[in-house]
Design a protein with these regions (language model features):
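Class I S-adenosyl-L-methionine-dependent methyltransferase catalytic core
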Residues: 1-192
Length: 192
């Protein structure tokens, strides 16, 4: 997928405008039309094309150490983890690990958690393009404080996305590649 493809689909001139516009379009009643346009330029649904786009144009690799999991690593992990009814992807990014697990287990329900507001639209688009059923928590995994919870429901071709108030806890196989470079100080952590 070329940068210009996504700029044209979202109707914006700059890559930094894509996340906000993409999320707006994904939550609109015409989201199927958007997903069809993306599908026409996306390429292979077996890999995470948004991973490459996001890292090239939007990630903060220096400041936030946003280096996302390569598709090859995601593929290996997807093959190694046993079958489960539900997959939980903590620090999901654009969804590379989830997509690769889904490639091996297409009936899995997913639960993704992601902190970054800029990558959430790409994660939602990736899941909806594949007609995946699941929940996406946008917020802090450690504190359990969320900006939004998104529910994806299978449709005829693409998942529909709705913002929901809450979701019951989910259990399942866990796959994750957290930002190991983030600093953490347990001194003032209430949990300890």
């Amino acid at each position: 997928m070329k940068e210009t493809d996504l700029l044209n689909i979202c109707g914006v001139n700059e890559s930094f405008d894509v996340p906000v516009k993409l999320l707006e379009l994904l939550l609109s009643p015409n989201s199927d039309q958007l997903l069809e346009q993306i599908s026409n330029v996306y390429g292979d649904l077996q890999i995470d094309e948004f991973n490459i786009y996001y890292q090239t144009y939007l990630s903060e690799r220096g400041k936030l150490k946003q280096d996302y999991t390569p598709n090859e690593v995601g593929k290996l992990l997807g093959m190694l983890i046993g079958e489960a009814d539900t997959l939980i992807d903590v620090c999901a990014g654009s969804g590379t690990l989830t997509i690769n697990y889904w490639n091996e287990h297409p009936n899995v329900k997913v639960c993704c958690e992601e902190f970054s507001s800029r990558v959430i639209p790409f994660l939602l688009a990736n899941l909806a393009l594949r007609n995946i059923d699941g929940i996406v928590y946008h917020g802090d995994t450690l504190t359990r404080k969320y900006e939004h919870i998104y529910r994806l429901c299978k449709g005829d071709k693409y998942s529909t996305i709705q913002i929901v108030e809450e979701s019951k806890p989910i259990e399942g196989a866990v796959i994750m590649n957290p930002p190991y470079s983030l600093g953490w100080n347990p001194m003032n952590d209430e949990r300890l």
